[in-house]
Every structure is written in structure tokens, then in C-alpha cells.
């Protein structure tokens, strides 16, 4: 999965600058906050040359399992339906008239499984990124400035005052600092993430708490992390 810097949009023109100690600590905690919450409701906006996709659903950061409903934007409905994914697999349930939100209990049949693609698919890259936004422990705050983490501005997301910061996409991807933007609240809560993937020109946007979190139930063919 290739990850590159997404620039512009919503940041204060005075940025970038080095992070303060408080900002470093909040950025180090932000993925752990998702794990602490067990799961978060998400809306994943995936751009594409032939029209985009929007995934509305939930991610369980303890079990590394996501579940949602997919709708196409600016394209036909051939990709619409339910979706559930892990770090290595994807299961889809096509629906001609997909609901606005996924049902709390997934259908027992009608699912088709496949491996999650590590490259070449903007959707699969977006799903993998969303799963990677949780960690069972805080990131190393001392290493973040060394890896190029920076502050880019202030913004508001659904009434929450946030700082926009760049940093690594996950604990084991320190080289991606300055390539992923996080909208982080005063307590370290993550409200938005924006990142570009190599297969499309516009960034993927992941918004949190866009609807009520619904606990994720595994479907046949998708094995969550224990």
C-alpha cells in the first residue's frame, strides 16, 4: 500500500511548524484512543477516476474488523452493498438497493470473500488504512519529532476544535511521517484522517463519529483478530 502526502484544505496558513510537547503527546495517544473506545463509527470517502465510493459503518479496533455499507458516487450501483473486512480479507454482499446504514446483524448468506489487495485498489487501501488507525498502546512520543511530525493548522469538525497534524500512519510505518494528516481534539481523540494512496490522485478521507457506532459482528469467511 503506497501512502503519500495530502496537502491543502482547512489548515492554518501559518503551518507547518514543529509540534509542542502537548501536541506530540496527543498525536502519540490518538490511535490508542480508538483502541480504548473499542470501536468507532466511520465514513470512508474513496475517490476514483470512474466515480467514488463511500463506506459508512464501524471499525472494531480491538478485533481489527470493519463492517459497513458501500455506495457509489458519480457511478452506477454495481459496487453497492455490504462489506466486512480484516487486514487480509474482504467479504462483500451485493445489494441493488443498499440501505443508508448497514443492518446491525449482517445477513447470514450471500457473501463473497476475497483477499484484501495490498496495492492497486483505492478501496482496499482505504479499508486497510482505517483498520490501522487503532493501536493497543500509545506511539512513542519521543520519536515523533525525529520522524518529521508537524502541526499544520486548526479547524473544527462537527463542533469539535481540532489541531491538524502530520505523522506516521501506524507504529511500524515511521517513514510515513508528514504523509498522513490527523484532525485531533484536545484529549487526543481522532476526528478525521486524510491520506493519499498511490492508485488515485485525490486523498482518501476518513471521518469519525458520523453516525452511531454499531458493534461489528463477524460474517462467514471473515476471521477477526482475537
Model region roles, listed by residue range:
Residues 1-62, 215, 220-226:
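N-terminal leader/targeting segments and the immediate start of mature chains
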Residues 36-43, 62-69, 158-166, 188-193:
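Short, hydrophobic/aromatic-rich segments at coil-to-beta transitions
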Residues 44-47, 69-74, 92-96, 169, ...:
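Beta-turn initiation residues at beta-strand->coil junctions
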Residues 47-53, 73-80, 173-174, 199-201:
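Solvent-exposed loop/turn segments connecting transmembrane beta-strands
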Residues 56-62, 81-84, 148-155, 182:
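Short, exposed beta-strand/loop patches in secreted or surface proteins that constitute
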Residues 63-132:
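An acidic-aromatic
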Residues 104-157, 221-225:
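Solvent-exposed helix/loop surface patches that form functional interfaces
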Residues 158-225:
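Gly/Pro-enriched, hydrophobic low-complexity segments
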Amino acid at each position: 500500500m503506497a501512502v503519500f502526502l495530502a496537502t491543502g484544505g482547512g489548515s492554518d496558513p501559518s503551518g507547518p511548524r514543529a509540534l509542542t510537547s502537548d501536541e506530540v503527546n496527543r498525536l502519540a495517544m490518538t490511535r490508542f484512543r480508538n483502541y480504548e473506545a473499542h470501536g468507532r463509527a466511520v465514513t470512508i470517502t474513496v475517490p476514483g477516476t470512474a466515480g467514488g465510493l463511500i463506506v459508512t459503518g464501524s471499525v472494531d479496533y480491538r478485533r481489527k474488523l470493519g463492517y459497513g455499507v458501500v455506495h457509489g458516487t458519480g457511478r452506477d450501483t454495481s459496487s453497492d452493498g455490504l462489506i466486512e473486512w480484516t487486514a487480509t480479507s474482504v467479504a462483500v454482499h451485493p445489494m441493488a438497493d443498499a440501505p443508508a446504514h448497514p443492518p446491525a446483524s449482517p445477513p447470514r448468506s450471500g457473501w463473497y470473500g476475497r483477499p484484501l489487495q495490498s496495492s492497486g485498489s483505492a478501496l482496499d487501501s482505504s479499508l486497510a488504512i482505517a483498520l490501522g488507525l487503532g493501536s493497543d498502546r500509545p506511539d512513542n512520543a519521543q520519536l515523533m519529532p525525529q520522524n518529521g511530525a508537524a502541526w499544520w493548522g486548526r479547524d473544527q469538525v462537527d463542533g469539535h476544535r481540532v489541531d491538524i497534524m502530520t505523522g506516521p500512519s501506524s507504529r511500524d510505518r515511521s517513514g510515513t511521517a508528514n504523509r498522513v494528516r490527523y484532525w485531533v481534539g484536545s484529549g487526543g481523540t481522532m476526528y478525521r484522517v486524510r491520506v493519499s494512496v498511490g492508485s488515485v490522485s485525490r486523498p482518501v478521507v476518513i471521518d469519525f463519529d458520523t453516525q452511531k457506532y454499531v458493534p461489528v459482528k463477524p460474517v462467514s469467511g471473515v476471521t477477526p483478530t482475537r
